[in-house]
């Protein structure tokens, strides 16, 4: 293993991923990490804003185009990485989500991420999860699909990967001012 470790951050241009990128690049004790941010559009304004915000980080930040619904793009991005920070979303831009079937795309994304991480032999996988509300409530609340699907992805990661850490930030509201880098 080289002295520089590659960490791949999914969702690098959105709230959680952007915060992870910022944390990895801002602390001197983490200078041995090279950060690879994944985004669907490396030429988009969020990607450019991320690069601009971290232009003083030297060559430690690179952006790569990848999509959670394209397992091969994830595998290519994960090659040679030590760790992955993964987040899945319950929404698809421009599409209204109302039913369980509408939200199953999140499971597909999670399956792709975990499978690519396994194939790339990722040493440590960090995933933002949520509790399984159906299980926690003893079945009383059984239609909180976003939570339950994230919990299923977490279980899959723990079962399939060498080392997995789950962060449970809870459900939160994103305020317009939090979009700033």
State where each predicted segment sits.
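Oxidoreductase cofactor-interface core, primarily capturing Rossmann-like NAD(P)-dependent enzymes
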Residues: 2-34, 38-53, 69-72, 90-105, ...
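Conserved Rossmann-fold cofactor-binding substructure of NAD(P)-dependent oxidoreductases
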Residues: 48, 55-83
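Rossmann-like NAD(P)-binding element
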Residues: 79-93
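Aromatic "clamp/platform" in nucleotide-sugar-dependent glycosyltransferases that forms part
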Residues: 106, 110
